[in-house]
Amino acid sequence: MAIERTFSILKPDATKRNLTGAINALIEQAGLRIVAQKRIRMTRDQAETFYAVHKARPFFGELVDFMVSGPVVVQVLEGEGAVLKYRDVMGATDPSKAADGTIRKAHAQSIGENSVHGSDAPETAAIEIAQFFSGNEIVG
């Protein structure tokens, strides 16, 4: 498999409970490297742009409100097959269906407060990374 990058967000429910270190440990144990990371408070405009694909969905407003409710940690992860590997590490969106050992099984509180976001494809990852990081902020 090729070395690739993916984008990750540790959501407000995770940062509120000081889970950054615990989640980072699971990421690194899976063989992924954190090559960029910063803690930010997402603006409403950033959240609406980031989740624009869901704009017509009934949960869009609630999702945006949640993402601006507290700090998030945005990350760039790197490794072999990083997109799929991180999706495996995250686990199912519904924590009750997530496998043991996954981030969501261990830390998510609900489908909505599911602790993390990860890109769904390499192309999406590139777009998402560019929304939050400049090239010189990514140090591989």
Curated annotation (Swiss-Prot):
<comment type="similarity">
    <text>Belongs to the NDK family.</text>
</comment>
<keyword id="KW-0418">Kinase</keyword>
<dbReference type="InterPro" id="IPR023005">
    <property type="entry name" value="Nucleoside_diP_kinase_AS"/>
</dbReference>
<feature type="binding site">
    <location>
        <position position="59"/>
    </location>
    <ligand>
        <name>ATP</name>
    </ligand>
</feature>
<dbReference type="GO" id="GO:0046872">
    <property type="term" value="F:metal ion binding"/>
</dbReference>
<keyword id="KW-0597">Phosphoprotein</keyword>
<comment type="subunit">
    <text>Homotetramer.</text>
</comment>
<feature type="binding site">
    <location>
        <position position="87"/>
    </location>
    <ligand>
        <name>ATP</name>
    </ligand>
</feature>
<keyword id="KW-0067">ATP-binding</keyword>
<dbReference type="InterPro" id="IPR034907">
    <property type="entry name" value="NDK-like_dom"/>
</dbReference>
<comment type="function">
    <text>Major role in the synthesis of nucleoside triphosphates other than ATP. The ATP gamma phosphate is transferred to the NDP beta phosphate via a ping-pong mechanism, using a phosphorylated active-site intermediate.</text>
</comment>
<keyword id="KW-0963">Cytoplasm</keyword>
<dbReference type="GO" id="GO:0006241">
    <property type="term" value="P:CTP biosynthetic process"/>
</dbReference>
<dbReference type="InterPro" id="IPR036850">
    <property type="entry name" value="NDK-like_dom_sf"/>
</dbReference>
<feature type="active site" description="Pros-phosphohistidine intermediate">
    <location>
        <position position="117"/>
    </location>
</feature>
<keyword id="KW-0479">Metal-binding</keyword>
<protein>
    <recommendedName>
        <fullName>Nucleoside diphosphate kinase</fullName>
        <ecNumber>2.7.4.6</ecNumber>
    </recommendedName>
</protein>
<keyword id="KW-0547">Nucleotide-binding</keyword>
<dbReference type="GO" id="GO:0004550">
    <property type="term" value="F:nucleoside diphosphate kinase activity"/>
</dbReference>
<dbReference type="InterPro" id="IPR001564">
    <property type="entry name" value="Nucleoside_diP_kinase"/>
</dbReference>
<feature type="binding site">
    <location>
        <position position="104"/>
    </location>
    <ligand>
        <name>ATP</name>
    </ligand>
</feature>
<feature type="binding site">
    <location>
        <position position="93"/>
    </location>
    <ligand>
        <name>ATP</name>
    </ligand>
</feature>
<dbReference type="GO" id="GO:0005737">
    <property type="term" value="C:cytoplasm"/>
</dbReference>
<keyword id="KW-0460">Magnesium</keyword>
<dbReference type="GO" id="GO:0006228">
    <property type="term" value="P:UTP biosynthetic process"/>
</dbReference>
<keyword id="KW-0808">Transferase</keyword>
<feature type="binding site">
    <location>
        <position position="114"/>
    </location>
    <ligand>
        <name>ATP</name>
    </ligand>
</feature>
<keyword id="KW-0546">Nucleotide metabolism</keyword>
<dbReference type="Pfam" id="PF00334">
    <property type="entry name" value="NDK"/>
</dbReference>
<dbReference type="GO" id="GO:0005524">
    <property type="term" value="F:ATP binding"/>
</dbReference>
<feature type="binding site">
    <location>
        <position position="11"/>
    </location>
    <ligand>
        <name>ATP</name>
    </ligand>
</feature>
<dbReference type="GO" id="GO:0006183">
    <property type="term" value="P:GTP biosynthetic process"/>
</dbReference>
